[in-house]
Swiss-Prot record:
UniProt cross-references to InterPro entries, sorted A to Z: Ribosomal_bL27, Ribosomal_bL27_CS
Keyword annotations of the record: Ribonucleoprotein, Ribosomal protein
Protein name: Large ribosomal subunit protein bL27
HAMAP family: Ribosomal_bL27
Gene3D superfamilies the UniProt entry points to: 2.40.50.100
Upper lineage: Bacteria, Bacillati, Cyanobacteriota, Cyanophyceae, Synechococcales
Region (Disordered): 1-23
GO CC terms of this entry: cytosolic large ribosomal subunit
Family, as annotated: Belongs to the bacterial ribosomal protein bL27 family.
PROSITE patterns in the cross-refs: RIBOSOMAL_L27
Residue spans of biased composition, Polar residues class: 7-19
């Protein structure tokens, strides 16, 4: 039985926190200006109409409205925000 820890066990023993990425507002949901729509690494989803892109590729709404996920091409997705129609 060892009376000292091995060198590996003292250097291990940490785990990084989850990054909490993903879609935060889905298609059809209403958003206010500045609301985060997608948190991502890289551009899996591209910004469309009335959507801004942060330095960490986060997509956010530039106006109040309704979220709509669309296809730019067959392989590229984009998200847009359209003004809510008054009913």
């Amino acid at each position: 039985m060892a009376h000292k820890k091995g060198t590996g066990s003292t250097r291990n023993g940490r785990d990084s926190n989850a990054q909490r990425l993903g879609v935060k507002r889905y298609g059809g949901q209403t958003v206010t200006a500045g609301s985060i729509i997608v948190r991502q690494r890289g551009t899996q989803v591209h910004p469309g109409n009335n959507v801004g892109r942060g330095k960490d590729d986060t997509l956010f709404a530039l106006i109040d409205g309704v979220v709509k996920f669309e296809h730019k091409t067959r392989s590229r997705r984009k998200v847009s925000v359209y003004p809510a129609t008054a009913e």
